[in-house]
């Protein structure tokens, strides 16, 4: 909610440039970084632009997302998948995030829209080091960032150990 409030304040704040034109401060932002809950806001703003302000609260902020994840975890229909290797509660959460917020969008979809560059950070659980979801880092991993669903990118930095499983990037 904090990151969304910051974007709202930047949207409302007007500045005057040297030519005397009034501009929104939000339109002057070149990069947005996000970690944990802020990754949802950063990615959604990059995907939707100003439409975010019409839909984000209803679609995401004011929903009981934790409750929905818990209900899905307790649903016997999901138990086989949850007990398999390579698929865990974070994948279940990412599927929910797709349904309620990201609509299956990938990093590749972000290339087709205007807006600030978005850098989402997570933690590599094996080394404890920070991983920033940049093209360069994905090239190093020999992974295709363009096909990575935004929902999985948002799930990675919010994957609290024990509560949500780590997100694996192949």
Q: Where do the protein language model's features map onto the residues?
A:
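Patatin-like phospholipase
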Residues: 2-87, 91, 134-137
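Short, contiguous clusters of charged residues that form electrostatic/catalytic patches at enzyme active sites
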Residues: 4, 8, 95, 99, ...
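Generic, well-ordered alpha-helical scaffold segments in large soluble proteins
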Residues: 9-13, 100, 157
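Glycine-centered secondary-structure boundary/capping sites
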Residues: 14, 101-102, 106, 126-128, ...
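Secondary-structure transition/capping residues
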Residues: 17-18, 108, 165
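Short, structural beta-strand-to-alpha-helix junction motif
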Residues: 24, 100-111, 149
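Active-site gating loop/helix substructures
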Residues: 66-83, 95, 112-170
């Amino acid at each position: 909610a904090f990151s969304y409030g910051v974007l709202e304040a930047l949207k409302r704040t007007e500045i005057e440039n040297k030519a005397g034109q009034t501009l929104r401060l939000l339109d002057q932002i070149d990069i947005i970084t996000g970690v944990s809950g802020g990754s949802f806001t950063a990615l959604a703003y990059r995907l939707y632009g100003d439409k975010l302000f019409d839909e984000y609260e209803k679609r995401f902020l004011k929903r009981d997302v934790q409750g929905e994840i818990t209900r899905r975890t307790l649903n016997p229909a999901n138990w086989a998948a949850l007990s398999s290797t390579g698929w865990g509660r974070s994948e279940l959460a990412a599927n929910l995030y797709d349904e309620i917020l990201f609509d299956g969008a990938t990093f590749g979809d972000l290339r087709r829209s205007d807006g600030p560059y978005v850098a989402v950070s997570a933690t590599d659980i094996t080394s404890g080091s920070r991983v920033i979801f940049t093209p360069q880092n994905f090239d190093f991993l020999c992974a295709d960032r363009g096909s990575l669903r935004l929902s999985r990118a948002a799930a990675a930095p919010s994957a609290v150990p024990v509560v949500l499983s780590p997100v694996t990037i192949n």
